[in-house]
């Protein structure tokens, strides 16, 4: 078909956010995947389905879209051992638990100088019963840009989850969630190293935040405080674009449902990722 109209049928990576479709380890300077792209939006979120995709381009820009109807989620979203709303727990994959399609669409525009901005939306039904139909939706905005002759790269994503939760459920199962992350990577050395002609040494920084329950207590009206904050500086060595050795220091604060003083943790992480 035309570049604007291409058909895809089979197992589809739902185009919600950017990380879900671009999750390969060698693309990143960080050992862990972002929390918002793994604990809000399910990691490597794919389902059986079909849809259209396409793009058009001008001199300095590219405009693309994707639109799919797929399977979606089941009621494990609000019936799981985590005792909170968790979309990754309710991925249906090749099965359609609700009997209804989940629709996902994305529109992205890329400028040669300014970078790429994407907006995506998912909506579906996760309950199996017609009489008690429960809906779920995800809205996401993502950005990716390279500057200073590709020596500075900025990547980020924000996701907002909303869903119907029966009134009989306890308040740990929130109706709204939000998460975001920003990665900043700068190349400080780019020259031949130990026989690798295009080796790079990069400094990196990730800031991320996830709020698993943005609701308020019905008794007091006070906000529910189940959230995680993290800052992750790192350094990496790339002998080529397809291989990365990385060292991260992850500092994280996690606040519980009741808003008690946050628990703090810190870890040094080592990683190697490559295409073989």
Task: Label each region the model flagged.
Residues 28-29, 40, 114-276:
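Outer-membrane beta-barrel pore domains
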Residues 32-33, 87-88, 227:
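General secondary-structure edge motif
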Residues 1-75, 99-103, 108-116, 181-194, ...:
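Outer membrane beta-barrel
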């Amino acid at each position: 078909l035309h570049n604007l109209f291409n058909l895809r049928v089979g197992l589809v990576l739902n185009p919600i956010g950017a990380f879900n479709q671009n999750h390969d380890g060698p693309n990143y300077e960080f050992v862990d995947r972002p929390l918002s792209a793994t604990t809000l939006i399910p990691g490597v979120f794919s389902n059986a389905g079909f849809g259209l995709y396409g793009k058009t381009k001008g001199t300095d820009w590219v405009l693309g879209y994707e639109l799919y109807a797929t399977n979606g989620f089941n009621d494990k979203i609000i019936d799981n051992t985590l005792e909170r709303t968790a979309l990754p727990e309710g991925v249906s994959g090749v099965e359609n638990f609700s009997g209804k399609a989940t629709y996902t669409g994305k529109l992205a525009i890329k400028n040669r100088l300014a970078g790429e901005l994407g907006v995506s939306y998912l909506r579906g039904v996760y309950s199996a019963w017609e009489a008690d139909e429960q809906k779920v939706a995800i809205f996401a905005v993502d950005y990716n840009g390279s500057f200073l002759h590709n020596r500075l790269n900025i990547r980020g994503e924000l996701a907002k989850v909303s869903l119907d939760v029966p009134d009989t459920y306890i308040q740990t199962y929130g109706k709204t969630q939000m998460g975001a992350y920003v990665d900043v990577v700068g190349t400080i050395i780019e020259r031949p190293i130990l026989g690798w002609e295009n080796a790079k040494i990069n400094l990196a920084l990730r800031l991320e935040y996830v709020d698993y329950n943005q609701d308020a207590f019905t008794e007091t009206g006070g906000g529910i405080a189940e959230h995680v904050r993290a800052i992750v500086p790192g350094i990496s060595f790339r002998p080529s674009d397809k291989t990365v050795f990385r060292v991260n220091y992850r500092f994280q604060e996690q606040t519980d449902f009741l808003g008690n003083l946050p628990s703090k943790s810190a870890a040094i992480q080592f990683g190697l990722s490559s295409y073989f």
